Amino acid sequence: MAARRGRRDRVAPPPTGGPGPDPGGGVRGGSWASRSQAPYGTGGSVSAAEQVHEEGNDSSFVSLSRLGPSLREKDLEMEELILQDETLLETMQSYMDASLISLIEDFGESRLSLEDQNEMSLLTALTEILDNADSENLSPFDTIPDSELLVSPRESSSLHKLLNLSRTPPERDLITPIDPLGPSTGSSRVSGVEVPLADSPWDFSPPPFLETSSPKLPSWRPSRPRPRWGQSPPPQQRSDGEEEEEVAGFSGQMLAGKLDNSVNNVLDFPMHLACPEEEGTAEGADAPASAPGDESISSLSELVRAMHPYCLPNLTHLASLEGELEGQADADADELTLPEGCVVLEIVGQAATTGDDLEIPVVVRQIPSGSQSVLLDESLGSSPALQLLMPTMESETEAAVPEVAPCPDEELPLSSACLLEPREIMESLTPKEPQSLPASASQGSQKVPRKGRKKKNKEQPTACVEACTRRLRSSSRGQSTVSAEVNSQAGSSQKQPQEELQREAAALQSRGKPRAWARAWAAALEKTGSENLERSAGQDSPAEEDALDLCPKLLETSQANPTLSLNDSAQADSMPVDSVEGDSPAVGNAAPGDQASSGTELVGSLPVGPNLTSPVLADKKGIEPAVAIPTSDNLSPADVLANTVAADPVPNDPAPADPVLVKCRPTDPRRAAAAAAAAAQGSRPSLQSADHPKVVSPEGKDVVGPLKVEGSTSATTQEAKPRPLSLSEYRQRRQQRQTEAEDRNSQPPVVGKWPSLPETPTELADIPCLVPSAPARKTAPQRSPIAVPETVSVGSNPVSPTPEPSASKLMVSTHSEQVSSHEMPLAVRPPPPPLPSVSPAGPIPSTVPAPLPPFPPSVPPLLPLPSGGHGVPRLPPPPLQPPGLPVSMRQMPPDPYTQYAPVPPWSCYPSVSPPGYSCLPPPPTMPIVSGTPGTYAVPPTCNVPWVPPPAPVSPYSSSCAYGSLGWGPGLQQPPFWSTVSPPPLSSVPTGRAVPPTPVEPSGDPAGPPEDVLPGPVTPSLSSGPASPAAPPVEPTKPEAQPVPVSPQPKHKVSTLVQSPQIKAPPTLSTEGVVFEESVSERLKSETQENRPKEKPISTAIKSVPVPKQSAVAKLPAVHPARLRKLSFLPTPRAQGPEDVVQAFISEIGIEASDLSSLLEQFEKSEAKKECPLPASADSLAVGNSGIDIPQEKKPLDRLQAPELANVAGLTPPATPPHQLWKPLAAVSLLAKAKSPKSTAQEGTLKPEGITEAKPPATACLQEGAHSPSPVHVGSGDHDYCVRSRTPPKRMPALVISEVGSRWNVKRHQDITIKPVLSLGSAAPPLPCTATSQEPLDHRTSVEQADPSAPCFAPSTLLSPEASPCRSEMNARTPPEPSDKQQSMRCYRKACRSVSPSSRGWQGRRGRSSRSVSSGSSRTSEASSSSSVSSSSRSRSRSRSRSFSPPNKRWRRSSCSSSGRSRRCSSSSSSSSSSSSCSSRSRSPSVSPCRRSDRRRRYSSYRANDHYQRQRVLQKERAIEERRVVFIGKIPGRMTRSELKQRFSVFGEIEECTIHFRVQGDNYGFVTYRYAEEAFAAIESGHKLRQADEQPFDLCFGGRRQFCKRSYSDLDSNREDFDPAPVKSKFDSLDFDTLLKQAQKNLRR
């Protein structure tokens, strides 16, 4: 900024670039820098302002916009303000980064007296901006004070202010150079802004840029005759020239301390940048400086209108700071023109907010490489902003950037994010590339309207990419923003190669110049990004080139998703950006040249979709996506990943600066979007090839079903451009944006709107039938490019979103993820189904993504969200996984992937789309992500091969519960896989993994799709803490492995469950979340493998992905935590008896047929204090429970998949509900939870319940709880049968599985939301066996006190605890009840799940359970379980009302399972005396109690009322009998006793009252016993007054009452304030009337 101003003023600004008191440039420069920054961060004018806010300058810039008019009005005041310079600086410091402040200060230092004035103007403008920016520009990413957040966007007003204030005629401004504050014409007009613009250096002839720019300006902004510069167009041209010089000379000043007027070749973008449409079209023809300036002003207004006011204000402020930039726009642009490598992106619109209408081109002006380079070099040294802009390639990028800004909004938000948190933007180069790309697109589109610009963006991908690169470099610290920008730009231009980008950049440069404010923004970015740039300064040049290399790939990705970019620069691009950020870190390979080429292809398809989905999900879920943006191409994929990972945990870490993960705070949608953008760039190349159509479709337009869910997520991401923001800031801005977005959307200048954060879906997405899911699975391969990548993105993006939540975890995961990440992209690239399968097999982080890929086809969006991190990413755990996953996807191409290239699973999953599974290896990526590096490695083996991964089991186990997953041994076998499936889920993954399982059912080759799904889901559920139990669970085989599984899973699950539950941050974070995803995917694969005997696993995985996407689609509506719970729900699915048990255990806590049942479950669980396990512990332990569930549920899984779907009522069409209710249904029920259908259904229903009833922690717990419980619930009516049958044998180890299975009951599948993790840990060992007989009782007790028996208790306990309330509170412990308990709970959960219809289901289910139990002994056993579940559900509901339900459950447990089942089943059943009666009586007892209470109260009230009525009647009687005497004008000193004494002379007084009034006479009422006494008092009462008193005003009291009973001022009633109805006479003394009257009076 200082440099630019210096060039403008022909004074070398201080190398630091502090704002100098430029005649016109000081303020203007400062403003410009601010603006420059703001656009960078905001993706539009507002973006700039917001970015400034983020940096602290954002606010000042916004203020500048508002300050503009005041500056014009107060040109002299600006000087006065200079006096307040220090104060202003102090004020701004809170809002501005030290760099910007230093720029301002430095400006003053290096400037002449002119600079002092400029500084004054700048300070004034900045101060005003800071004061007003908040209200003016509400950017989700702005670090603007609450005031701005609270203030609604001043769209038009800000724009007009800015336009009016921002530009004085060029002549004025140009004249101003002589008189910095100078001639009042320009200086007074722009005050601070104009002053800086008007500098002696401004006399330089305008550079070609301004000329080019000014022609543009006319198109979108008619040239105004405003003499902003105080000089004629020539001065403006000089300004342009100066501006160019400033870019070059900026560096020169910074470096050489002199303006380089020769930098005329630099094409600067003046206001046309701010108003790209007008500027680009009209201004392009008018080169006159004055015209541009005038047009800038006029155009700025138009620009402001075009863009959202909040956006424009930033641009406006920038323009104002720019010294009425529009008038001087060209000159200013040159001044602001960043150094050679710098890319100045001027975003007129805020794509994030506006979405498609973001037409504000991000003007990345390429300064001549020659002079610019030198200046830039020095500038880099002096000015961070310059450093950022300096990258060697920046000149090329700059050339490209100048006019290509199709998604300036996105870009700006990205820039804003970058500027806001440079520390978070470790990869300055790569992020710069993305930003440069958008900048280039912005410039390209600048000439045309924003839409046209968007098209241009596509047309000019090279320039865009280059510009993005420039910009990314410029705003290294705004990498998130850069990524977003690049994403938006990449969508259209990333396809093109570097050379193309460069050529296009040159063309774009000739086409249009970056605006002055864009340059200022670039300068600001340079300053802010300088840190990052410095970090990557060594690699800046190479990194620049690498970035360009990456940029082309990114462009490829972007072009792969042109629809996204085109769809909505803000929305689609933002979303892609988010995705890219989330995935790009993983695709970090794209950052390095080598990585870019290899990783781009690999990550290309994979990252884009997944990342897009993941970022969106993360955004939607408020999870902070970590974006790893490789800084240099030289980094290897692994290096990039490592850097990304490191960057994610330590965004500011210089070492991983290249592929640094840019974390977006979960609550910062913009930042998430930015991260997504960064990831998207890396992943977009792949997407473009395979996923582009779908990714773009879902993200841009939700074309694909799975992508639809993703699209909504993407839309969210797109809407909210990720930008480093604190959680509080993000929340504030989100709220603001929600309110403001509405206003802005309604307002014409929607283009500049900030993307409004999409609200978490409150309603469950329609759950596709599990059967349809299978087709969807097949579709998944088709969608693989999009769905799978998105899924992967989700998987990886969860890592990205998770980075912040689990920085350390991410780091751990990152290591493994790095390899798996890359592999995952490959897997993702293949059809989503394979990828999900691969993902599960691969790194856990991939697991979530892998599930997501399957989901994209149908259920994926819904389920993947919870399981794949799409839904889960919102959850805190998913975010952990996303960081590693994206990185892994990108950076770890084939390590785990190749390692675990479990081609068999993918081979098994050929139907899923073996082509898509060309990346089979990627699935192993999941394992890597899943655990720490070791852990992830294990899951991959299990995940991909599902049978072959025995070896990885140990790593899995080592990682956490995941290691214990032992998928290698058990996964290979169908039962084992099912069992294994749950273990991965045990940790946080439980929720996530489960969703993948639901997907499985649709495509499950073995048995019902749901069957397949349960397996994978169960593993997912158990994957985490249950991982240790997983190996035992893995032996899903009913009896053979039950013992090993039983002891190990139980023990390990308990340990892991408790460990992850309570303290699974490392495991849970990395494994929990990442592993969850991995397990989810892997469990899917496992389950499917078990079902198809390893071959179907692939198919199952495929099917799982499809249902998952469906679930994902629904899940978005559900809260992230709830989504995770949903994920968990499907997880519990046992292939064999043990699997069934484990499925039950796994699902115990998470069962829920629908939201209502979920809520019920949750309520019961919470209400029930029997399960003391902490929600968090349960949440952590969810994975453990999940692990067990899959094994237990596997046998039942196949049958239950359809049945569960029907039972849950989520996919009734797909599966006949009664089919699975048969004895086989027991297994089916258990597996149902895992089945894709049930998972999807549960995901759908359960998200509802979870969303409503369970908090995120509760959701996790419920996931864990439901992991064990699914077996029971999953069985549905047969659940109790299966449960009873299975509990004794495998209950100890398989309880979790059983639980998972339990909740798989048709209704229960969604009902089972209780995480059985904790419960599983505490109660599983004991309840396992005992629960069979008394599952409810044990579950209740275990639930309350024994977190060590999660397997059994979870299933049973979860049933009651599965209720929304209980799920959270008791879900942790309840999942420990015996299988029966779990079954009962599942059953009950099913009812609860369905809540409204769930209760009806309860009866039906209970009856069904009874019939089933009587049907067969196994069914009987399961039936008792189911019936217990039903009872539990009943109690759960009761529990919702009171805490008695736990006791009821206990009683129920005491009762025979069968009896209990029947009782629960039919509340009218005689056997329900104990349990059903209890629960019922409890509920009734509460009623009776309340009733008695009410009666008592009512009685007392009636008595009181009666008394009141009696008094009223008495008074009325007395009044009517004329016994009440009204005494007025009572002296104030008189007391009631005195009054009574005085009037007692006339007779016996029954009552005497005195009423004192502040105003008016005091009065009283005296009631005599006899009327004659009253008459006497009235006649002679006046004689009683004393000499000093006024005569009493005597009359019969209540005379007003006679007229109007309700008016009691003078009534004797009034003295008592009796509420008795005045209007009712004694004759109308009936109780009702009196009561009504009394109430009425009381109201008065």
Curated annotation (Swiss-Prot):
Annotated region (Disordered), positions in chain: 1-61, 170-249, 429-616, 646-761, 773-884, 978-1074, 1322-1507
Domain RRM per the UniProt entry, residue ranges: 1523-1599
Source organism, top-level taxon: Eukaryota
Residues found modified as Phosphoserine: S232, S541, S1059, S1393, S1395
Induction of the gene: Up-regulated by serum (at protein level). Up-regulated by serum. Up-regulated weakly in brown adipose tissue by exposure of animals to cold.
Polar residues bias spans: 437-446, 475-496, 556-572, 811-821
Comp. bias intervals (Basic and acidic residues): 691-702
Chain positions covered by the region annotation Necessary for interaction with CREB1 and NRF1: 1361-1432
A GO term from the CC aspect: nucleoplasm
CDD domains cross-referenced by the UniProt entry: RRM_PRC (cd12624)
SUPFAM superfamilies according to UniProt: RNA-binding domain, RBD (SSF54928)
Function description: Acts as a coactivator during transcriptional activation of nuclear genes related to mitochondrial biogenesis and cell growth. Involved in the transcription coactivation of CREB and NRF1 target genes.
Subunit details: Interacts with CREB1 and NRF1.
Name of the protein in question: Peroxisome proliferator-activated receptor gamma coactivator-related protein 1
Protein's gene: Pprc1
